[in-house]
């Protein structure tokens, strides 16, 4: 049985317990499709999709239906003309750099898009809402890129508000990991999705005023030991020398020719000066706000889950 307590707002599962909640949910992904969704260094396989993500997609499917009934009840109370109009269900996915939250978001998008009643599922990353490099330099916070203050939080909040309010088309800025900057004039157009997934480092943050996390209907925090995340970050950094960093136009092209030893030292410096402080100070404290925490072992596999029941 799942571990719970009458006085706790959470119920905890190991993977064996969680997988029983899949019920008859069919596996709709192929190995080839999963390969295209898997991030660099990720070890996710179809077994993990079946045992972790299918029960999760079933839970979200049930919550989408329940949330629509709640929205309809409020609309009826307000006397609106179309109380049954669908309101986009917004999911937040948070976690550290290199923890695998992007893979989680992509796999979830693929599974949810195949449910019968909500085929349109859009995914937007908060990278597009970083301030452009010129603005970060003007503010003197280029070294704080990825920290909460490096994002245009008002713009992100306005974007999600417009999507959830039913706007016919809303534009999300696009970020390039090659140029390490916002791409001028390029946008990801969101057109009235049934479900919108917002993935980013700091999406669960709160504040004295309305925050984007206040608009989430469901949220996921991808968790792991800090030491494991550091190791994954370093391994990913080493691998990027042969992929993204090898592009002559890449912002980090100067790392491409480093030896393993020098690249490891560079990655450790970035981790300890930027990514670890951001995780400890800003990201990790938001974990209790998540509806569901996915806990990874050192081999990247999800083996424990914590669901907020209240």
From Swiss-Prot:
Annotated catalysed reactions: (R)-pantothenate + ATP = (R)-4'-phosphopantothenate + ADP + H(+)
Keywords linked to the UniProt accession: ATP-binding, Coenzyme A biosynthesis, Cytoplasm, Kinase, Nucleotide-binding, Transferase
Gene Ontology biological process terms, A to Z: coenzyme A biosynthetic process
Compartment(s) of residence: Cytoplasm
Pathway: Cofactor biosynthesis; coenzyme A biosynthesis; CoA from (R)-pantothenate: step 1/5
Keyword presence, Glycoprotein: no
Residues reported in the UniProt entry to bind ATP: 95-102
Record has Cytoplasm as a keyword: yes
One GO MF term: ATP binding
CC per GO annotation: cytoplasm
Annotated EC: 2.7.1.33
InterPro entries cross-referenced by the UniProt entry: P-loop_NTPase (IPR027417), PanK (IPR004566), PRK/URK (IPR006083)
UniProt similarity note: Belongs to the prokaryotic pantothenate kinase family.
Protein's name according to its UniProt entry: Pantothenate kinase
Source organism (scientific name): Rhodococcus jostii (strain RHA1)
